Amino acid sequence: SRPYLEKIKKECKKLDVKLELFYANRLGIFNMIKLVKEVIIAEENNYIYVNVASGSKIQAIACMMACMILKECTNIQPFYAEPETYAAFEGKQQSFGLKDTIPLPIYEIQTPKQKLLDALKIVYTHDKQKLTKKEMAVLAEENGIITVNAENENHSQARFASLDKNIIEPLVKQWGFIEIEKIGRNRWITITEEGKNAAEFLI
């Protein structure tokens, strides 16, 4: 791909087009989704066209998923670039020219509310990706993820109730991002594999 990149650089320079390069592991789909999301958000004041035909299938899926996740952005248009011809032999450039561009519809992908993502981030970044509900309750209140309206003598109980209803329950039952395990007198919150995958590109 290096020769093609150099050619693109030269063409952009001729046309006085600003070019920025971003690098990602081409086999890491979640890392790629996050990177595409960040680029789109950084360019939110511009019209954004996403070519899903250039690159591997993993890259195409990552680009399309990033567009679907950013459902609130109305200035994104993913498209498929249909080439004029295809290579006759393996080992050569796979396609040539541009016959047409086909706009692709964006279907919405549901994502958790921001407070749930903030809570998931606490678990994901915590030591060994687990912590007690008591620790989580304190951190959630300190970070404004939950609010507690109670007198001092009822504060701890009200904090647990708010954490359970607004954070723990949806993350466990609706999203499957965390699990609760009782060990001794403590209840431990641990992140699931699905939660780890989601954290890779949502937080």
What are the residue ranges of the model-derived segments?
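Polyanion-engaging groove/track-forming segments
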Residues: G55-I58
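Short glycine-rich phosphate-binding loop at a beta-alpha junction
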Residues: Y47-A53
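Long, low-complexity, Lys/Arg-enriched
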Residues: S1-Y47, I61-I203
